Design a protein with these regions (language model features):
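Short, solvent-exposed loop/turn elements at beta->coil junctions and helix N-caps
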Residues: 31-37
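Conserved C-terminal structural/oligomerization subdomain of aldehyde/semialdehyde dehydrogenase
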Residues: 35, 42-175
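General beta-strand structural signal in soluble alpha/beta enzymes
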Residues: 27-30, 114-116
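Short beta-strand to alpha-helix junction loop
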Residues: 3-14
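Short intrinsically disordered, low-complexity coil segments enriched in acidic
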Residues: 1-3, 154
Length: 175
């Protein structure tokens, strides 16, 4: 895995991890700069075991960081996913397609990946819900965001149209 976009971004992710650990998160893997890569914006991919009330569960990271929160059941998982002012993307891992489809329908997120993390396709609309995205980009729906539609009808000639007003002028105006 390559470096982050900048050392500033790496430092921001380090602060997020430090805050999570301060709140009681367990670092399952990663959580620091690689010792052999001292130059640049490198940060190890990190998995944190967290609780729902931790700050990290209510913000966006945009770094190599995955907070994992154990849940009792699908109802709790959906409730936790929706307990956020954000809604860009959600990842679901399951072999139970009935549960997957239920979660896809109930999670308030603009993107949902099921067993296929972060795959993307430029032909599919991309965007979030809530505070992470009004509107869409990419795909046909994304193009529609830049379009202003207008209805225009043009008759090829200026002749009266019997389908629109099928009465001769003499019948219509000599009543």
């Amino acid at each position: 895995i390559g470096p982050m976009a900048s050392t500033r971004e790496r430092d921001r992710v380090e602060k997020i991890v430090a805050r999570a650990v301060e709140q009681g998160a367990k670092v399952v893997t990663g959580g620091k700069r690689p010792k052999h890569l001292t130059d640049g914006a490198f940060f190890e991919p990190t998995v944190l075991e967290v609780k729902p009330e931790f700050d990290i569960m209510h913000g966006e990271c945009f770094g190599p960081l995955a907070p994992v929160c154990k849940v009792r059941d699908l109802d709790e998982a959906i409730a936790l996913a929706n307990d956020s002012k954000l809604g860009l993307g959600a990842n679901i891992y399951t072999e139970n397609l009935a549960e997957a489809f239920r979660a896809v329908n109930e999670i308030e997120s603009g993107i949902v990946w099921v067993n296929t993390p972060l795959n993307d396709n430029d032909a599919i609309p991309f965007g979030g819900r809530k505070f992470t995205g009004a509107g869409r980009e990419l795909g046909q729906e994304g193009l529609e965001q830049f379009r202003r539609s207008k209805m225009v009808m043009i008759a090829p000639t200026a002749e009266p149209d019997p389908e629109w007003f099928p009465y001769p002028d003499s019948d219509a105006f000599n009543a």
